[in-house]
Structure formats: C-alpha cells, structure tokens
Amino acid sequence: EISLGLVGSEMCIRDRPGDIKYKDVNGDGVVNDGDIVAIGSTSKPNLIYGLGLSATWKGLDVSLHFQGAGKSQFFTYGKCIWAFTEGQWGNILKGTLDNRWVDAETAQKLGIPANENPNASYPRLSYTDNGNGNTTIYEYKNNYRNSTYWLRNGSYVRLKTIDVGYTLPKKIVNKIHFNNVRIFMTGTNLLTWSSFKLWDPEMGASRGEQYPLAKSITLGLSVNSVSYTH
C-alpha cells in the first residue's frame, strides 16, 4: 500500500505521502521487525511443465512446443527499480520515474513534473534515506524492504519453439530430379505470457540485470536428391 498520510512506527519514522505503509501483523500498535513474517514461495519454480502439439495438412506441417513454470515468486530490487541507490545518483530508468509518486517538493528540486498518483506502481521518489535514520543498512530503508509490495509472480507460459514447413508436391520435385523438398521456418522464444512485464520471467532474476533469452527465427530449405542405381 502507498501511504497517503503519516504512520507512527519504529520502522518508518520519516514516512511521507507516497511512502510504503506496512501492516501491524501482531497487533501491538507498533510496526517493527516483530511484524516480519514468511511470505511468498520460492524463486525456483515448484512446477515446471511442457506441452507439444503437431499437425499436418497436405504439404503443410506445424509443430509447437510450449514450456511453463508455476508456483514461483521473487522479490524485485536493485537500481533498475529503486531510484538513486547503489551509487547510481545521476540517472534512473524513465519507466520507473513515469509510474512513481513524485511530490511537489522533490519535483521542484529535480526540475520535473509532480506526479502525486495514489495508484502509482512505485513509491515516492527520493534520493536520501527514508528509513529510521540508518543510512548504511539497506534493510532499514522504509520503501526498500522486502515486502508483498515488491513480491512478484514468477509464473509464465512460453512458446518455446515453433516449426512451420511446407513440402513441395512429388510431381513438382520429381521433375527437377529431387526426392523431397521442404521449406521451413523455426522460431524460438517468440511469445511469452506472464503477469510480470519488467524482464524475462524465465531468468528468475530479482534485479533484471541479466540478458534475457534471445528470440530467433531461422529459415531453411531441406532437399533430398534422387539416388540412381546401375
């Protein structure tokens, strides 16, 4: 939840509008490390599956291979989404700025438009510690603690490979003294369905600083010549 007001707690001493507000899990009236509980599942998928389909019609053939993973969650963190952290003081990604709470004071300092959007995907833009005053320990910073706010679903379904081919009719290939001629196209990692959109969910990466699996398309021609005997 993005807070629209101040919260009195040990964990969040300097909360401002747009900061993350945490639940008082144990109900003692104070939000602190005593409210930390286990959440989510493992970043390694507990379910991996696949499905293969193929069909032919006259000279046309199509083969599909789907791959998926489920029962997986991971926390997102790092400089890709946490503005002005890890020594990256000069720049932030445009996508994280455009969909973030930016109060008028910060906007004026940075020379950018204010964006006090209560439905923003990211909390208040800040370039100083907004936790309990400890500027050296990341875990103590209010907006950048592991929580359900940063927990993401790692499940996905991917069209891993697709192969489409066309075999020329025999009456045509025999005239040019071939036994079989097939034209084909093979694609890899062309489509992915996932609720997670920031980077490739198959990487299982929390920071998004790895190369995603490459998409590829291959065009080919398969030819079998006629064998003659004497």
What are the residue ranges of the model-derived segments?
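Surface-exposed extracellular loop regions of Gram-negative outer-membrane beta-barrel proteins
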Residues: 46-62, 168-170, 222-223
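Membrane-interface anchoring segments and C-terminal beta-barrel signals
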Residues: 75-77, 114-227
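Single conserved hydrophobic/aromatic residue that forms the stacking wall/gate
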Residues: 1-8, 13, 228-230
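A generic beta-sheet turn/junction motif
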Residues: 6, 55-59, 212
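Outer-envelope exported proteins of Gram-negative bacteria
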Residues: 11, 52-56, 63-69, 165, ...
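Surface-exposed, extracytoplasmic segments of Gram-negative outer-membrane nutrient-acquisition systems
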Residues: 9-10, 14-43, 61-151
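Transmembrane beta-barrel architecture of outer-membrane proteins
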Residues: 44-49, 68-70, 157-160, 215
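Generic recognition of flexible, low-complexity loop/linker segments
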Residues: 38-40, 49-52, 171-172, 206-208
